[in-house]
From Swiss-Prot:
Known function: The glycine cleavage system catalyzes the degradation of glycine. The P protein binds the alpha-amino group of glycine through its pyridoxal phosphate cofactor; CO(2) is released and the remaining methylamine moiety is then transferred to the lipoamide cofactor of the H protein.
GO biological process, one term: glycine decarboxylation via glycine cleavage system
Keywords for the protein's UniProt record, in alphabetical order: Oxidoreductase, Pyridoxal phosphate
Protein name, UniProt field: Glycine dehydrogenase (decarboxylating) 1
HAMAP family in alphabetical order: GcvP
CDD domains registered for this protein in UniProt: GDC-P (cd00613)
Molecular functions per Gene Ontology: glycine binding; glycine dehydrogenase (decarboxylating) activity; pyridoxal phosphate binding
Organism from which the protein derives: Pseudomonas aeruginosa (strain ATCC 15692 / DSM 22644 / CIP 104116 / JCM 14847 / LMG 12228 / 1C / PRS 101 / PAO1)
Keyword Cell cycle appears in the UniProt entry: no
InterPro entries recorded: GcvP (IPR003437), GDC-P_C (IPR049316), GDC-P_N (IPR049315), GDC_P (IPR020581), PyrdxlP-dep_Trfase (IPR015424), PyrdxlP-dep_Trfase_major (IPR015421), PyrdxlP-dep_Trfase_small (IPR015422)
Reactions accelerated catalytically: N(6)-[(R)-lipoyl]-L-lysyl-[glycine-cleavage complex H protein] + glycine + H(+) = N(6)-[(R)-S(8)-aminomethyldihydrolipoyl]-L-lysyl-[glycine-cleavage complex H protein] + CO2
Primary enzyme class: oxidoreductase
Pfam families: GcvP2_C, GDC-P
Origin organism lineage: Bacteria, Pseudomonadati, Pseudomonadota, Gammaproteobacteria, Pseudomonadales
Similarity annotation: Belongs to the GcvP family.
Length: 959
């Protein structure tokens, strides 16, 4: 008889299984870190960090965590409630195929989706090249020389085009913008939202009936129209130009492979969506939009722009160009608050074009159009009135009294058609359509008993339905990069080559302050590519999206619990758009009370640049509030300015914990001062990762906050987007949350789709569900512990600029490098570049204080990784001391010359320090070394010699 092995007490549950996977430090590490800080427990540390005035404000009431497998099964059951019917709705959203090598090697690859915005170009060359490919794709197809690195969605891009035209039009007397009624309805809705606070009148009408062109400073046209017609806009554009108005054209990128591009018929701006280049429908997003314009207007273009420069060795290198245009620099003078792009989605579109090449894209476009032409010919034989003479992929049909019955019949057959009105319906085809789909559509639209057309006969007899005078004559995608990677092997290796050039979370900690580069767990990411979430059209009938409704309802409740607010909107598809929606809600609230004069927004001097930029966009005037020597809001200055502007005070925008990395003791008093003067308090949720489960902004004075789901709640940054920026509000602001034409409240849309970037919301649902209430609280506590551990280890080498009353920081700390500039000539930029030689992404540079580094380790980094970073920073300080002592030359030293490339080390070595010191300053680097692909990039050269499309092939051959 065999004795039973006694394993002792075993926990049979999996409630906290994921928490230990998400949080980096082990229990023993946590105790060691606490001991170093002089605390006996995590509770004691947190008790000394959180101000007494807000302790107990948390209302986090969530169930216990759930194991990974259990959470995935639970979410799968929710997803199963969605019914992804075959969609022919169109209206800017189309079925497409995501090529398998792009799905596996890019979209599902953490080397791509965990990277940050490429502000440090030397360690971002891979995704910068991919984005340059995207810009070249857009520039080629639009016929305009300058394209940016993507926008949030087509409707947002259209709104940016409107304000762009307002700034640049020489028609200074007009406040009216013409928008064709043939534009997508969701675009028109966002235009109206964005125009009203700026005093712009959006006139929606038929462009063929315009009598006084001088009444408008600009216009937006759709090409082809939403209903499918291909219109010759050449004369119309000329008439607008004759009165100094600018013209923006919303154009379908796939159609532009066959049609004359907007730039060739005079458009000043082209905007649109790249969704159909390999990105799933996703119930509306995320998708990459595009924005292209003339060279003369490049400095006024919104969004990010990738350009070509050189490194210090004269080698071509990519970088973000003309960054002085961006809102974080221009602040209240900014003309846009866009501070991100849809990089991951733009890179998918970029690689879709690289993989298919010009001939592949033309095949897709021609096949899509031919099938549409055959469909139209068959419908006409069946007696159905096709309203378009010329079209690309979309038809509108006059179906009269039969319309409702046809829709019902289609849905019973698993098909969605576009609902235009009671007597008309629409059909949009795409790259996934085949002969059987066309025959099925004939069957749905035929009268009972009618014989269906013969497909083969119609295919042979029907011609194209593109207007001859608008056929494209110019070549597309002639650059070699679009003509060499057409086999899966070649594309796979190209993607690997690019990924190897970059630093992302799959290689190293990214300690960027105010960015919260935490773990994006694999189990959170898996549902993103489920067909149940990816294949649903955002305008499908409501009964087909019950799974999404359950997901969003549950997620809104979770976020209310985390923040203490009463209502949440998930529509904003970036933090900047959440800010905008929050200030719009405040503005609308004041107007509803007859307080339209309230237009003053108080903003601390330490605020992120989006805050003043957003305030300006909603028509508010910014008044800056001073900060004291410890980095806190100067309460007396706030009191004086709130009192001075009492009758006009609309809002205070404040980040909490502060952008200086401190929990300000006076936050309740600050909120009360503003409320007493009739204002509302907007608490920027960028730093929510320090608060979840510990304190709740909705309970200590906030009226509204936006949350960065791509920070606190684990949606990956994707190399610079996507993001989600939902807003939470107190009950009195709930009626003023963003609306949508397909929702109960019709006005106030800030995104094209009702739920913005809906298909990545499962990431946050999974994170919250697996962590549970206790896990979320522990994440906040560990983020604070990790930040204080780094601050404590480094404070004897670099001054920690700000701390709270107990000498502790929140979830991030700021190191002051300004004294080093005076003593050694070493700048913050030199330290940032030197960190690359150690295999690290630099912390946030010179924000919120010039000459500093802001470090945010997050809860996901282990003690070993924190120590590795601290060891690197300490070794760098030793190198600076060597410069101070004269042991290293002030100009020829490892910091001034950083980063060092492999090619440099293999070449002739003329430096006063060794190759080993340059490349292997720590012994640990011998085991695993990251090599920056280029040396330090010359920013000035890049802006003076601006090139924003793919460089000639010779540049690639030099690699």
């Amino acid at each position: 008889m065999t004795d039973n092995l006694n394993l002792g007490a075993i926990d049979l549950g999996t409630d906290d299984e994921f928490i230990a996977r998400h949080i980096g430090p082990r229990a023993a590490d946590t105790q060691a870190m606490l001991q170093r800080l002089g605390y006996d427990s995590l509770d004691t540390l947190i008790g000394n960090v959180i101000p007494d005035s807000i302790k107990g404000s948390s209302v986090l009431d969530l169930p216990a965590g759930m194991g990974e497998a259990e959470a995935l099964a639970s979410l799968k059951a929710i997803a199963a409630r969605n019914r992804a019917l075959r969609s022919f709705i169109g209206q800017g959203y189309y079925n497409c195929h995501t090529p398998a090598p792009i799905l596996r090697n890019l979209l599902e690859n953490p080397a791509w989706y965990t990277a940050y915005t490429p502000y440090q170009p030397e360690i971002s060359q891979g995704r910068l090249e991919a984005l340059l490919n995207f810009q070249t794709l857009v520039s080629d197809l639009s016929g305009l020389p300058i394209a940016n690195a993507s926008m949030l969605d087509e409707a947002t891009a259209a709104a940016e085009a409107m304000t762009f035209c307002k700034r640049l039009s020489k028609n200074r007397t007009s406040q009216a913008f013409f928008a064709s009624r043939h534009c997508h309805p969701q675009t028109l809705d966002v235009l109206r939202t964005r125009a009203e606070p700026l005093g712009i009148e959006v006139v929606v009408g038929d462009e063929s009936t315009i009598e006084d062109f001088s009444a408008y400073f600009g216009a937006l046209l759709q090409y082809p129209t939403c209903d499918g017609e291909i219109v010759d806009y050449r004369e119309l554009v000329s008439r607008f130009h004759a009165v100094d108005a600018l013209v923006a054209v919303a154009a379908d990128l796939l159609a532009l492979t066959l049609l004359t591009p907007p730039g060739e018929f005079g458009a000043d701006v082209a905007i649109g969506s790249a969704q159909r280049f390999g990105v799933p429908l996703g119930f509306g997003g995320p998708h990459a939009a595009y924005f292209a314009t003339r060279d003369a207007f490049k400095r006024d273009m919104p969004g990010r722009l990738v350009g070509v420069s050189i490194d210090r060795h004269g080698k071509p290198a990519y970088r973000l160009a003309m960054q002085t245009r961006e809102q974080h620099i221009r602040r209240e003078k900014a003309t846009s608050n866009i501070c991100t792009a849809q990089v991951l989605l733009a890179n998918i579109a970029s690689m879709f074009a690289v993989y298919h090449g010009p001939q592949g894209l033309l095949r897709i476009a021609r096949r899509t159009h031919r099938l549409t032409a055959i469909l139209a010919a068959g419908l006409e034989r069946l007696g159905v009135a096709v309203e378009q003479k010329h079209f690309f992929d979309t038809l509108s049909l006059a179906t009269g009294a039969r319309t409702a019955a046809i829709h019902a019949k289609a849905r019973a057959a698993g098909i969605n058609l576009r609902e235009i009105d009671a007597g008309r319906l629409g059909l949009s085809l795409d790259e996934t359509v085949r002969q059987t789909d066309v025959e099925t559509l004939w069957g749905l639209l035929a009268e009972e008993g009618q014989a269906l057309p013969d497909f083969a006969a119609l295919a042979a007899s029907s011609g194209d339905r593109l207007p001859v005078e608008l056929l494209r004559q110019s070549a597309i995608l002639s650059h070699p990069i679009f003509n060499r990677h057409h086999s899966e092997t070649e594309l796979m290796r190209y993607l690997r080559k690019l990924a190897d050039k970059d630093l992302a979370l799959d290689r190293t900690m990214i300690p960027l302050g105010s960015c919260t580069m935490k773990l994006n767990a694999a189990s959170e990411m898996i549902p993103v590519t489920w067909a149940e979430f990816g294949n649903l059209h955002p305008f499908a009938p409501a009964e087909q999206s019950e799974g999404y409704r359950q997901l969003t309802d549950e997620l809104e409740a979770m976020l209310c619990s985390a923040t203490g607010y009463d209502a949440v909107s998930l529509q904003p598809n970036a933090g900047s758009q959440g800010e905008y929606a929050g200030l719009l809600a405040i503005r609308a609230y004041h107007q509803s009370r007859g307080d339209s004069q309230r237009d003053i927004c108080l903003i601390p001097s330490s605020a992120h640049g989006t805050n003043p930029a957003t305030a300006s966009m909603v028509g508010m005037r910014v008044v800056v509030v001073a900060c004291d020597a410890r980095g806190n809001v100067d309460v007396e200055d706030l009191r004086n300015k709130a009192s001075e502007h009492k009758e006009r005070l609309a809002a205070l925008m404040i980040t909490y914990p502060s952008t200086h990395g401190v929990f300000e003791e006076a936050i309740r008093e600050i909120c009360a001062i503003v409320h007493d003067c009739g204002g509302q308090v907007y608490i920027d949720g960028a730093n929510m990762n320090a608060m979840v489960g510990l304190c709740a902004p909705g309970k200590f004075g906030g009226d509204v906050s936006h949350l960065n789901l791509h920070k606190t709640f684990c949606i990956p940054h994707g190399g610079g987007g996507p993001g989600v920026g939902p807003i939470g509000v107190r009950a009195h602001l709930a009626p003023f949350l963003p609306g949508h034409a397909r929702g109960e409240r019709k006005e106030g849309a800030v995104s094209a789709a009702p739920y913005g970037s809906a298909s990545i919301l499962p990431i946050t649902w999974m994170y919250i569900r697996m962590m549970g209430g206790e896990g979320l609280k522990r994440a906040s506590e560990m983020a604070i512990l990790n930040a204080n551990y780094i601050a404590h280890r480094l404070e004897e080498h670099y001054p920690v600029l700000y701390a709270g009353g107990n000498g502790l920081v929140a979830h991030e700390c700021i190191l002051d490098l300004r004294p080093l500039k005076d003593s050694s000539g070493i700048s913050v930029d030199d330290v940032a570049k030197r960190l690359m030689d150690f295999g690290f992404h630099a912390p946030t540079m010179s924000f919120p204080v010039a000459g500093t580094l802001m470090i945010e380790p997050t809860e996901s980094e282990s003690k070993a990784e924190l120590d590795r970073f601290c060891d690197a920073m300490i070794r760098i300080r030793e190198e600076i001391r060597a410069v101070e002592r004269g042991e290293l030359d002030k100009e020829d030293n490892p910091l001034k010359n950083a980063p060092h490339t492999a090619a440099e080390l293999l070449g002739e070595w003329n430096h006063a320090y060794s190759r080993e010191q340059a490349a292997y300053p720590l012994a640990s680097l011998v085991e695993a070394k990251y090599w920056p692909p280029v040396g330090r990039v010359d920013n000035v050269y890049g802006d003076r010699n601006l090139t924003c499309s793919c460089p000639p092939i010779e540049a690639y051959s030099e690699e």
